[in-house]
Each structure stands twice: as C-alpha cells, then as structure tokens.
C-alpha cells in the first residue's frame, strides 16, 4: 500500500517537473497569454461583485523605455545582473528583521517575482515558497536576464486591473511605454510594492520621496548603460 502510494507520488512529481520545465522553455520565446496573478485578480473582482476588465498589451523589449527598465532594477533588485535568482544576503537580512518582531519584510528578486506572478497564488506558505524556488531556478536556467526583465515588465501590476508597462504608461501618463521619461519611470517603479494602494500619476509624499530615491539609484547604477550588464553570456 505504502510502496504503491510512493510510486504514484513519484510519478506525479516527475510529470510536474517535466511539465513545468516544458512551460518555462516555451515561455522563453512565446509571450505569455496571461499570468496567475491576473486570473486571481479577475476572480477576486467577481467575488467582490465588481468585475474588472484587465488592461494589458504585450510590449517587446525594444519598445519599452530603458528608463523604466533601469528604474525597476534600481527600486526592486539592484543585484539583478549578477545573482542567479536569489539574493542570499537580502534573504538573511529579511529573516533577521522578521525574527526581531518587525513588520514582515520580503526579499524577493525580480526573478522570484516573475515566478510568483506567472505561476503561483498569493499568500505565504512553505509549499508556495518551495514552488517559487523551483520556478525561479528554472527561469534563471533557461531565460536570459533580458527575457526575465521583459516578462516582468509585461506582467507587473500597476493599478486595479492594470498590468504591464504599456498599459501602465497609457493609464497613468497617457503615453506609450517607449516614451516614458525618467521621472515617470521612477514613479512607476516606486509604486510596485503596493500598486493598488499607491498611484504613480498621483503620488503621495511617500511615493514622491521613494521616486526621488529611485532616480538617485538609477544615476548611481549608470543609467541606461547599466543594461549592458544583462549580458548575452547567460543565454543558452
């Protein structure tokens, strides 16, 4: 009985591993039609009795402002070009902070955020964290850094029902994603930790201050020239 159950479990895990590898490989080239987060937000709106229409237009890498690319890295993951999906020192610092009884603080890299937004549900559990680590490793293994950032910029949430750089640029500033200024890019990056609560186009004092910090970090990183560090040597 137990051996039969273990065999079935092993087969299920093998099928899951093979299927997830196949999906991640396909998405290396094919634009994702949607994300788990988008589905979650849509279902939530139905249950709340306020159905929303999702705004999202896939925009290729070359049609997204370099200012936004650097702003997101500056605000969310300054070690993006050098790590392999996990910022261990940041994770250790977050764990120590949380153990001291402070407000729970995360340390997710951009790759981890892509894994979560694309494939997983919201919430905190060891199962979800384990799956997040699995998908993060696969994404780092099979995708280039440019592809990871491209998918992130097309799947990030920037308002109620607003997903991706193009929809965010149109919704908040009335321009295409390719025409975002440095200030606009910094304001969009500033609201990423809480895109429903905060507004990029009508920034609170805190968001404005955070956007200013992001602009300074962008300059320290070297501006758009920083993107050259997302080197092609990581590609298979």
Swiss-Prot record:
Broad class of enzyme this protein falls into: transferase
EC nos: 2.4.99.28
Transmembrane segments: 12-31
Membrane topology: Single-pass membrane protein
Predominant location category: membrane
Family: Belongs to the glycosyltransferase 51 family.
Keyword flag Membrane: yes
Pfam family, one: Transgly
GO molecular function, one term: peptidoglycan glycosyltransferase activity
Gene Ontology CC terms, in alphabetical order: peptidoglycan-based cell wall; plasma membrane
Keyword annotations of the record: Cell inner membrane, Cell membrane, Cell shape, Cell wall biogenesis/degradation, Glycosyltransferase, Membrane, Peptidoglycan synthesis, Transferase, Transmembrane, Transmembrane helix
Function: Peptidoglycan polymerase that catalyzes glycan chain elongation from lipid-linked precursors.
Catalytic reactions on record: [GlcNAc-(1->4)-Mur2Ac(oyl-L-Ala-gamma-D-Glu-L-Lys-D-Ala-D-Ala)](n)-di-trans,octa-cis-undecaprenyl diphosphate + beta-D-GlcNAc-(1->4)-Mur2Ac(oyl-L-Ala-gamma-D-Glu-L-Lys-D-Ala-D-Ala)-di-trans,octa-cis-undecaprenyl diphosphate = [GlcNAc-(1->4)-Mur2Ac(oyl-L-Ala-gamma-D-Glu-L-Lys-D-Ala-D-Ala)](n+1)-di-trans,octa-cis-undecaprenyl diphosphate + di-trans,octa-cis-undecaprenyl diphosphate + H(+)
Subcellular location: Cell inner membrane
GO terms classed as biological process: cell wall organization; peptidoglycan biosynthetic process; regulation of cell shape
Pathway: Cell wall biogenesis; peptidoglycan biosynthesis
Protein name: Biosynthetic peptidoglycan transglycosylase
């Amino acid at each position: 009985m137990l051996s039969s159950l273990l065999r079935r479990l092993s087969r299920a895990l093998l099928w899951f591993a093979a299927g997830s590898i196949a999906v991640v490989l396909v998405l290396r080239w094919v634009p994702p039609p949607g994300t788990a987060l988008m589905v979650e937000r849509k279902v939530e709106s139905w249950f709340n009795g306020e159905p929303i229409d999702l705004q999202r237009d896939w925009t290729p890498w070359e049609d997204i402002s370099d200012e936004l690319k650097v702003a997101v890295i500056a605000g969310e993951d300054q070690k993006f070009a050098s790590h392999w999906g996990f910022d261990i020192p940041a994770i250790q610092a977050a764990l120590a902070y949380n153990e001291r009884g402070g407000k729970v603080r995360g340390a997710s890299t951009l790759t981890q955020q892509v894994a979560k937004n694309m494939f997983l549900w919201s919430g905190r559990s060891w199962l979800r964290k384990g799956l997040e680590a699995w998908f993060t490793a696969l994404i780092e293994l099979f995708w280039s850094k440019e592809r990871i950032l491209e998918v992130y910029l097309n799947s990030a949430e920037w308002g109620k029902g607003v997903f991706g750089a193009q929809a965010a640029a149109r919704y908040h500033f009335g321009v295409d994603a390719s025409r975002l200024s440095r200030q606009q890019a910094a304001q969009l990056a500033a609201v990423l930790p809480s895109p429903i609560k905060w507004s990029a186009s009508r920034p609170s004092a805190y968001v404005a201050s955070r956007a200013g910090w992001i602009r300074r970090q962008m300059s320290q990183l070297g501006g758009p020239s920083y993107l050259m560090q997302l080197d092609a040597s990581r590609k298979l």
